[in-house]
Amino acid sequence: MKQATKKSGIWLGKMELSELSQIANKKGPVTAPINAGTLGGPYLTKLKGRGMEFAEARSYQPGDDVRHIDWRVTARTGRTHTKLFREERERPVMLVLDLARPMFFGSRQRLKSVQAARIAALMGWRALLRGDRVGGVMYSEKMHREFKPRGDRRHFLRLLSNIISEHNRVVDEMTKGEWNFVSKFLFAEALRRVRHVVQPGSLVYIFSDFSGFNAECRKHLFQLSKHSQLEAYIISDPLEKEAPPSGRYAMSDGEATAWVNSGNSKTRQIYTSTFDEQLKKLELELRLCRVSLKMLSTVDNVSHI
């Protein structure tokens, strides 16, 4: 298949994700800075974790918190030392992007994977405007890549460039018929690795259709939520929620075409009810894991978020 032009809804382009910085700039920072005193950082205390980073060790002084005694330095020097901390001035933000095969589906305007990349880019641009450090984790059946949070624009542009290249690589493979089986453990494994790279006090965005969600994912999300703030964007396509009117419809993977019958009104009603029930169950599971969530369709305008 010949590569489509930018903003086709199938392939990702650099300009498409870069332009979202203008939307982020128009809307302004999501969280306003506050003055919390001498040690105050830019955020209220709803952030999880200590929000402090190690600065140095010095000789223990009366009144120091005994919980902060640096036992290694104490043992090495023979004198009691205590750890000094400074409050983190920037919040780490991690963008977790699902590029597994189920995300490469779309019936209108764009693929779920394209919409996920767009909202991830927008959230990243907004974080940079707030002065936060932005990193990312993206994964598919063939790759898992991690980018440590940094506060400079060039680093974020490299992250976006990697998202574009990996996304378009999968599209290219699919159009050539190079299919891979989806592992039911892919999402859980990605979240397990996220737990090891996310710093306490981070804001973690997850962009996925959550088709791979299971009990193992629930465990990892719950552990993550103890020290970080989690926000999930559940990406869906209109055709997943509601079957089209009765008739025969062509569906294609870019190479082969199949015809499906949408059935009668009762069948379509069952179809919609099944989606709604599955979504309600997922929402409950995520809320129990202390994950705030938002639904996002492939036809939604991300600039309104």
What does each model-identified segment do?
Residues 2-43, 59-64, 73, 82-118, ...:
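Exposed, interaction-prone extracellular/peripheral surfaces
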Residues 67-77:
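N-terminal low-complexity, intrinsically disordered segments
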Residues 121:
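Conserved active-site region of classical short-chain dehydrogenase/reductase
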Residues 124:
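Substrate-engagement module of ASCE P-loop NTPases
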